[in-house]
Amino acid sequence: MAKLTKRQKAQVGKIETTKLYAVDDAIALIKEFAVAKFDESIDVAVQLGVDAKKSDQVVRGAVVMPNGTGKTKRVAVFTQGAKADEARAAGADIVGMDDLAAEVKAGNINFDVVIASPDAMRVVGQLGQILGPRGLMPNPKVGTVTADVATAVRNAKAGQVQFRVDKGGIIHGTIGRRSFDTDKLKGNLQALLDALNKAKPASSKGVYLRKVAVSSTMGVGVRVEVASITAGLAAQS
């Protein structure tokens, strides 16, 4: 485990480590802790009640953050013909087929998201060893292999976040930046938990959303009372 910095030790002194904070209070704390000279990311870790070693309990999906993420993503689309025109019109940064594949093979990977129409997977499939380790391989489960490339591009540009449970049963994600106000961060966190609830495996037993903690890039984590987040979801439904 990495040693705490002097600043992080000071932050820990302000937190009751056994306390579950209401979401508004937790966000206020991490915004207070985010004092770096850059606009720190606000991150979340969600412990799920799943056994990630079982294939039927792997939680994976995507959610469009209603308030964006504060990051502009470059989007590459593998498609052709009319679909290529639709992708460009929707805001895609790079569109191509074999020519784009050649760029990827040459190491020119200057994009954050890859989308592909189904007919393009014959080309994209050859790039698995390059795109896969970088988390860029298109997948229908997260909406990046689709005939509706225009919507996929718009979603990516609007702040869509992909999530996948790790071996420890934890989902990691970013819900915005320190410069976001509390309501925007809370709205994004609620959207993520809503998406996780919808992705709950049928075989998951017991408490599903077990623990939630938020932190800034350079700050320590603050545990959040799950009910204070999901209460907002209930009010919206």
From Swiss-Prot:
GO terms for biological process: regulation of translation; translation. Pfam families: Ribosomal_L1. It comes from the Bacteria. InterPro entries: Ribosom_uL1_bac-type (IPR005878), Ribosomal_uL1 (IPR002143), Ribosomal_uL1-like (IPR023674), Ribosomal_uL1/biogenesis (IPR028364), Ribosomal_uL1_3-a/b-sand (IPR016095), Ribosomal_uL1_CS (IPR023673). GO terms for molecular function: rRNA binding; structural constituent of ribosome; tRNA binding. GO terms for cellular component: cytosolic large ribosomal subunit. Keywords: Repressor, Ribonucleoprotein, Ribosomal protein, RNA-binding, rRNA-binding, Translation regulation, tRNA-binding. Binds directly to 23S rRNA. The L1 stalk is quite mobile in the ribosome, and is involved in E site tRNA release. Protein L1 is also a translational repressor protein, it controls the translation of the L11 operon by binding to its mRNA. HAMAP family: Ribosomal_uL1_B. This is Large ribosomal subunit protein uL1. Part of the 50S ribosomal subunit. Belongs to the universal ribosomal protein uL1 family. SUPFAM superfamilies: Ribosomal protein L1. It comes from Leptothrix cholodnii (strain ATCC 51168 / LMG 8142 / SP-6).
